[in-house]
Amino acid sequence: MLPLKQSEEALKDKRRLRWACRRGMLELDVLFEPFVDQAYDELSEEQKAVFRRLITCDDPDLFAWFMGHQKCEDEELAEMIRFMLSRVKV
């Protein structure tokens, strides 16, 4: 029964994560939601922590970073942004 409980917790966590990825901007929604569905499970625990940190950033900053209008100074976040852009085709 323990593996099932872990699986249920993982699903609950992923549902919460998908909810947190719903942004106020469509341009960000089309990046974050498919990434969670398609690639999040493949990330290492360290990468998942970086992703969770990324989604706490403000929408204007995220938009500027993903659209290439500004450079993200945090190298871990910048690497996650590059990875996400390589995985999600819009």
UniProtKB/Swiss-Prot annotation:
- List the Pfam families hit by this protein, alphabetically: Sdh5
- Signal sequence span is none
Highest rank taxon of the organism: Bacteria
Name its GO BP terms in alphabetical order.
Answer: succinate metabolic process
Q: Which UniProt keywords apply?
A: Chaperone, Cytoplasm
Q: Does the keyword Transit peptide apply?
A: no
* Major location category of this protein: cytoplasm
State the compartments where it is located: Cytoplasm
GO CC term (a single one): cytoplasm
Family of this protein: Belongs to the SdhE FAD assembly factor family.
Please explain the role this protein plays, according to its UniProt record.
Answer: An FAD assembly protein, which accelerates covalent attachment of the cofactor into other proteins. Plays an essential role in the assembly of succinate dehydrogenase (SDH, respiratory complex II), an enzyme complex that is a component of both the tricarboxylic acid cycle and the electron transport chain, and which couples the oxidation of succinate to fumarate with the reduction of ubiquinone (coenzyme Q) to ubiquinol. Required for flavinylation (covalent attachment of FAD) of the flavoprotein subunit SdhA of SDH and other flavinylated proteins as well.
What is the protein named?
A: FAD assembly factor SdhE
Organism listed in the record:
Idiomarina loihiensis (strain ATCC BAA-735 / DSM 15497 / L2-TR)
